[in-house]
């Protein structure tokens, strides 16, 4: 399994779903980047930073909203290590983007060796095994051959395809139960058992919480990162997780501003 040893306070945030229609969320994220650079020893972003990512070549002619976000990440990465993860929306994030930002690609899953101990980190969609249709889609788009064919298309073609896929996904999700779209408990237990860890952190489900489990007679924890929406949600929402020698603590974006 991939391992990453990091010391000091680690900040984690995921599921920002940044795009042209999320200026307030982007502004809040830029604030997080600045705060993390001041207070954290590393920032980890395990997936769905962007609502869609059709290939790293978009940065060569980035629209204003994207250019501002990239500049914010680049500035933070100049001060602390920043790790970019791939989610179900931005699975095409690659080395070109990481290099352009001075950031690192976050392997998935990854075993973090922290001041608090060993922690398993991943985006989380791989645990939603009850949603068989999504798992088939995930396997397809993670296939290197499919990705090569997609990236060979023009940017307008890729944008149109991504928009169509997003619409189909939203329509399909409306017909699915919330339970199907959540993680499968057996999949989570298997991951904890295989990694031999007591703490799992993931995003994806947009259900921030700390779950206490018992697996093989051991107390384990599953921490779910919050999603962000400062543009369309009322009240706005978002947050991040801090891991340090004292443990894990989740901070709410709105409460922290107050």
UniProtKB/Swiss-Prot annotation:
Q: Family, per the entry? A: Belongs to the LpxH family.
- Organism, by scientific name, is Bordetella parapertussis (strain 12822 / ATCC BAA-587 / NCTC 13253)
| Annotated binding of substrate, by residue | 88-89, 131, 169, 173, 176, 204
Instruction: Tell me where on the tree of life, at the top rank, the source sits.
Output: Bacteria
The record describes its membrane topology as:
Peripheral membrane protein
Cellular location(s): Cell inner membrane
KW Transcription regulation (keyword) present: no
Any one GO BP annotation for this protein: lipid A biosynthetic process
What Gene Ontology molecular function terms does this protein carry?
A: manganese ion binding; UDP-2,3-diacylglucosamine hydrolase activity
The coding gene here is lpxH
Q: Which InterPro entries match?
A: Calcineurin-like_PHP_ApaH, LpxH-like, Metallo-depent_PP-like, UDP-diacylglucosamine_Hdrlase
Q: Report the cofactors.
A: Mn(2+)
Cofactor annotation comment: Binds 2 Mn(2+) ions per subunit in a binuclear metal center.
GO cellular component terms given for this protein = cytoplasm; extrinsic component of plasma membrane
Q: What does this protein do?
A: Hydrolyzes the pyrophosphate bond of UDP-2,3-diacylglucosamine to yield 2,3-diacylglucosamine 1-phosphate (lipid X) and UMP by catalyzing the attack of water at the alpha-P atom. Involved in the biosynthesis of lipid A, a phosphorylated glycolipid that anchors the lipopolysaccharide to the outer membrane of the cell.
* Residues holding Mn(2+) 2: 48, 88, 123, 204
EC nos = 3.6.1.54
Q: Cite the annotated pathway.
A: Glycolipid biosynthesis; lipid IV(A) biosynthesis; lipid IV(A) from (3R)-3-hydroxytetradecanoyl-[acyl-carrier-protein] and UDP-N-acetyl-alpha-D-glucosamine: step 4/6
- Report residues binding Mn(2+) 1: 15, 17, 48, 206
UniProt protein name: UDP-2,3-diacylglucosamine hydrolase
Top enzyme class: hydrolase
> What PANTHER family does the database record attribute to this sequence?
UDP-2,3-DIACYLGLUCOSAMINE HYDROLASE (PTHR34990:SF1), UDP-2,3-DIACYLGLUCOSAMINE HYDROLASE-RELATED (PTHR34990)
Name the reaction it catalyses.
UDP-2-N,3-O-bis[(3R)-3-hydroxytetradecanoyl]-alpha-D-glucosamine + H2O = 2-N,3-O-bis[(3R)-3-hydroxytetradecanoyl]-alpha-D-glucosaminyl 1-phosphate + UMP + 2 H(+)
- Keywords for this entry? Cell inner membrane, Cell membrane, Hydrolase, Lipid A biosynthesis, Lipid biosynthesis, Lipid metabolism, Manganese, Membrane, Metal-binding
Family annotation (Pfam families)? Metallophos
């Amino acid at each position: 399994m991939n391992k990453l040893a990091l010391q000091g306070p680690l900040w984690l945030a995921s599921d920002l779903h940044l795009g042209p229609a999320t200026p307030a969320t982007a502004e809040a994220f830029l604030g997080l980047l600045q705060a993390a650079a001041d207070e954290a020893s590393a920032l980890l972003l395990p997936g769905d930073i962007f609502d869609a990512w059709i290939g790293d070549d978009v940065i060569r002619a980035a629209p204003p909203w994207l250019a501002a976000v990239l500049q914010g990440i680049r500035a933070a990465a100049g001060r602390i290590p920043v790790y970019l993860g791939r989610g179900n929306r931005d699975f095409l994030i690659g080395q070109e983007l990481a290099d352009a930002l001075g950031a690192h690609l976050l392997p998935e899953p990854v075993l973090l060796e922290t001041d608090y101990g060993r922690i398993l980190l991943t985006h989380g969609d791989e645990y939603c095994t009850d949603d068989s249709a999504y798992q088939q889609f995930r396997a397809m788009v993670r296939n290197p051959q499919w990705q090569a064919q997609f990236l060979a298309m023009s940017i307008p073609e890729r944008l149109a395809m991504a928009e169509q896929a997003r619409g189909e996904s939203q329509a399909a999700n409306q017909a699915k139960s919330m339970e199907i779209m959540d993680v499968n408990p057996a999949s989570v237990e298997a991951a904890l058992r295989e990694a031999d860890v007591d703490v799992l952190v993931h995003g994806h489900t947009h259900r921030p919480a700390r779950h206490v489990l018992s697996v093989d007679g051991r107390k384990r924890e599953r921490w779910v990162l919050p999603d962000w929406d400062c543009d369309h949600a009322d009240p706005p929402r978002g947050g991040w997780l801090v891991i340090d020698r004292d443990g894990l603590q989740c901070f709410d974006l709105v409460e922290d501003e107050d």
